[in-house]
Each structure stands twice: as structure tokens, then as C-alpha cells.
From Swiss-Prot:
CDD domains: HP_PGM_like. The active site is at H11, E89. Catalyzes the interconversion of 2-phosphoglycerate and 3-phosphoglycerate. Substrate binds at residues 10-17, 23-24, 62, 89-92, 100, 116-117, 183-184. Keywords: Gluconeogenesis, Glycolysis, Isomerase. SMART domains: PGAM. This is 2,3-bisphosphoglycerate-dependent phosphoglycerate mutase. NCBIfam families: pgm_1, PRK14115.1, PRK14120.1. It comes from the Bacteria. Pfam families: His_Phos_1 (PF00300). The record marks H182 as: Transition state stabilizer. One of its GO terms (biological process) is gluconeogenesis.
Amino acid sequence: MTTGKLILLRHGQSEWNASNQFTGWVDVNLTEKGEAEAKRGGELLKAQGVLPSVVYTSLLRRAIRTANIALNAADRHWIPVVRDWRLNERHYGALQGLNKAETKEKYGDEQFMAWRRSYGTPPPELEDSSEFSQANDPRYANLDVVPRTECLKDVVERFVPYFKEEILPRVKNGETVLIAAHGNSLRALVKHLDNISDADIAELNIPTGIPLVYELDEAGTVLNPGGTYLDPEAAAAGAAAVAAQGAK
């Protein structure tokens, strides 16, 4: 039986992760801690012999740099890299740039969690005149419509079809594929891989910088539901930290 591997790696801590701001499509960089997390992720891949033959990432530098740093640490810096906007983080609309704790205090827990974790409730749209808008960003010039806001359902609808068409066939063929992306684009994919309900996906948190490995057979069936973190203890602590965002 042919078995392929799918490695999911959320980018290391970004500048706005550190300052507790909604980031979305704003192209912020990694912090020094984020760079170290990305390196550690690559070292885990090398140490456990999970070596990708290709990497897919977004058009945002925090994911691109995470991929590059991790691949360098794993001695896989030479493999092909595919960048696509459909792996981008969820667009957080008018929340982009806002502090999470201040937003929670202003709008209340229920509205805050609906925007942040519900499956189908997008935040208010971002105006094209905002400094955080991507309306005139050249990397999205070929899109018919540049998103002004998204909910997780929107991310599923843009990313999962791309995954099925472009990435899944390689995994089914026995390749090991690395996806270096974002909290919500990876949540969208895990929802699909593990058949998580629209309600239950609200409870899923993806930690930064810790590889999550799925094994799939040639039919595309997941052989280890839920995946396997290469550092389970660090993953549990990291997921708890993500869940706590907005509380401080």
C-alpha cells in the first residue's frame, strides 16, 4: 500500500501575534521567537525523518519565511516551493490591525468569539481606503475580487478545492508534502481531513511552529485521524496559548 505524508506547519510567531493584533492578510514579519520556532520545526522534521519533497505556502511573508527557515534546518532548502493566495490566512476584515483584548472589551465576549471562532460569521468589511487593505496590492492583481472580509467557511471554500486538485494527488502518490501556512487556513484543512463539524471546529487551535503529520493512503483516506504532532507536549501548550488570545 502506498502511503503519503502531509505535514502541516503553522508559521512561527509573527509581530502581530506578539502584540495580540488581528493580522489576516496584513503582511507582517516573524519575530525572533517566530524564526526560532520555524527552525525548531525544521529540526523536528529532520530528526524524525519526515522529509518533504515539495512545499506549498501562502503569499504572506510570515508563512514564506517559516517555510524557508524550516527547510533550511531540515536540509531540504532545495525542494520546489509553490506559493498561492488560497493558502493565505483568513481575511479579518475591519478587525485587521485591532488589538484582540481591546476588541473583546469593546464588543463583548459573544460577538468577539463569533467573529474569531464561528464558522459562518465574518467580521465587518474592510474599507479599501484603510491602511490595512489589500485592494491595490500587486500580488492580488489577478484576482477578480480581493476579499474585504472572510469567515472560516470562506477559507474552506477557497482552500479545500485547491488542496484536492493540486496537493492531494501528490500525497496519494506517496509523496511527503509540507504545507506552511496560517492558523485559519490550516484549521480549514484539518476540518476537511478530520470531518469536523461546523460547530466543533470552533474548539480547534493550531500551535505555531510544530509540525502536524497526517498519513494518507492512495485513496486519500487519513490513516491517523487527528494527525500526529512531532512534539505533542509543546503542541498542547501552544494550542492553549492560541486559545487564550484575547484574554490579556
